[in-house]
């Protein structure tokens, strides 16, 4: 029996006003999630928290699974934009600083300024994400890594695509697995998570310098 089609957003905001509305919806979604969990998230509650009519919310999200789907994509797009801004575009940093930024952005789940995505959201991801969506995210991240290293004109010899894909898989896969298992310390002050990110930075640097 084929799987039921997953809910997804009805449309993407293109105008400034609609982008503002959708961002407000996501902000309300996160506030309700933090206060009441997934069970507390309803389209009516999100509309009330946002201060919009339920019908306006339905213009974008037919149900709360579609809202979760849109929010997950929002998290990915925010991360990709941050990688572009901090690790790909700058021309006044050396390769070591560029790589540190790239690894930290890829690994760190607690970076200020990026939308929150936690263990509980990961546990619900299967409701809205298919294998093709995971592959799309990986391909987008791989493109950023390749572009970031292409900008490392002072790193010679340049690492091979196979090396970069292996390092990305370790960094991104490790990030997601740590969200899944929640190692002791990650749920408290995050010190273990910060230590892991530093170890990943050191591992990537060691691999690049060992060639």
Locate each region found by the language model.
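N-terminal intrinsically disordered/low-complexity leader segments
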Residues: 1-20, 184, 211
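Alpha-helical DNA-contacting segments of helix-turn-helix folds
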Residues: 68-75, 83, 137, 141
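Helix-turn-helix
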Residues: 20, 24, 28, 32-66, ...
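Hydrophobic/aromatic-rich alpha-helical bundle segments in the mid-to-C-terminal region
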Residues: 131, 135, 150-203
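Hydrophobic alpha-helical bundle segments that form small-molecule/ligand-binding pockets
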Residues: 86, 92, 112-114, 118, ...
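Membrane-embedded alpha-helical bundles of multi-pass transporters/translocases
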Residues: 22, 54-56, 72, 80, ...
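Short hydrophobic clusters on alpha-helical segments that form packing/core surfaces
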Residues: 25-33, 75, 79, 106, ...
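Hydrophobic alpha-helical connector segments
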Residues: 70, 84-112, 164-168
